[in-house]
């Protein structure tokens, strides 16, 4: 058991967690019984939406690798645990910027997608999910 927090640092909950190291790994679902599974990024949600009190957290922070970046088109493929701050370090020197940025750069890509975050330009650019392609 490990303690996980949301950004508000309340509630503090000890949770069973499984760290994901490879995006193609299969989760040991048979070990979880009837408990629910919830992916966990960097814990920057204001509420407790990133906590799973009676379930299992799937810690995606180790999934922090880039898959591909095309500096011509600006298209980036990466894993769920990559922080927006790391993306900015990669894309800004190439003349790109994220179309939507929430109030903190310490959000993971997976968290930004799961919560469909928005920035101050929401009325023009929409949410993070508007710029995600499969």
Specify the residue positions occupied by each region the protein language model found:
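N-terminal regions that are enriched for targeting/export leaders
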Residues: 1-9
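Glycine-rich N-terminal segment of FAD-binding domains in flavoprotein oxidoreductases
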Residues: 8-106, 116-121
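FAD-binding subdomain of flavoenzyme oxidoreductases
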Residues: 112-134
């Amino acid at each position: 058991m490990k303690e996980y927090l949301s950004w508000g640092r309340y509630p503090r909950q000890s949770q069973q967690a499984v760290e994901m190291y490879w995006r193609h790994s299969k989760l040991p679902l048979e070990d979880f019984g009837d408990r629910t599974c919830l992916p966990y990024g960097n814990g920057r949600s204001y509420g407790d939406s990133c906590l799973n009190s009676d379930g299992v957290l799937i810690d995606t922070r180790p999934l922090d690798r880039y898959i591909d970046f095309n500096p011509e088109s600006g298209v980036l493929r990466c894993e769920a645990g990559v922080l927006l701050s790391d993306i900015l370090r990669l894309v800004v020197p190439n003349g790109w910027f994220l179309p939507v940025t929430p109030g903190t750069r310490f959000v993971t890509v997976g968290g930004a997608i799961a919560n469909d975050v928005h920035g101050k330009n929401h009325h023009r650019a929409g949410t993070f999910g508007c710029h995600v392609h499969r």
